[in-house]
Amino acid sequence: LAFAIPLGLVSAYKVGTRVDRVISNGLFIFSSVPSFVIALLLAFYIGVQLGWVPPLGYAPPFCSAEDIDSATACGFGEHFKLMVLPVVSLSIPLIASYTRLLRTDVIATLREDFVTMAASKGLSNRRILWTHVFRPSSITLFTSAALNMGALVGGALVIETIFSIPGIG
């Protein structure tokens, strides 16, 4: 949601412009590609070609009982590096879906009378967008995000298999 909200607001506020077309077309592509294909592409390009993170496999470092309470101990950075690709590959299709949903709701809300009234009162565009437009538009976004938690767990099963992460599958 951290990436979907700004992208959706910008795309809706700049509707019909080049920015909107770039965001919408990019999101259409990312929402059409399954998460396991994104996982394989990310593992190949970021893991193998660039070598930034380990492409496959999950071997967490050994942790003693004394180290568990510390975020810096027990290889927290190593865990983070190992989880970047699975998290990104699971979140890209959801970001695309949430952004498109928010964009549609914001465009509909921007055409409401109370938004015109807020603009005629002299409120700034930023205040109108965040207080008068985002709040009513975010209801469906957060409802959809809550309902997609089950699909996220189902998608995690495939991603765990691809990256050899011990978990559900």
Q: Language model features by range: what are they?
A:
Residues 28, 60, 159:
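Short histidine/acidic/glycine/proline-rich micro-motifs that form metal-
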Residues 24, 40-41, 87, 132:
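Residue-level recognition of transmembrane alpha-helices
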Residues 1-19, 35, 48, 64-169:
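Alpha-helical transmembrane segments of integral membrane proteins
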Residues 27, 43-47, 135:
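Transmembrane alpha-helical core residues of multi-pass small-molecule transporters
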Residues 25-28, 32:
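Residue-level signal for discrete positions within transmembrane alpha-helices
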Residues 36-68:
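Extracellular/periplasmic helix-loop junction at the C-terminal end of a transmembrane helix
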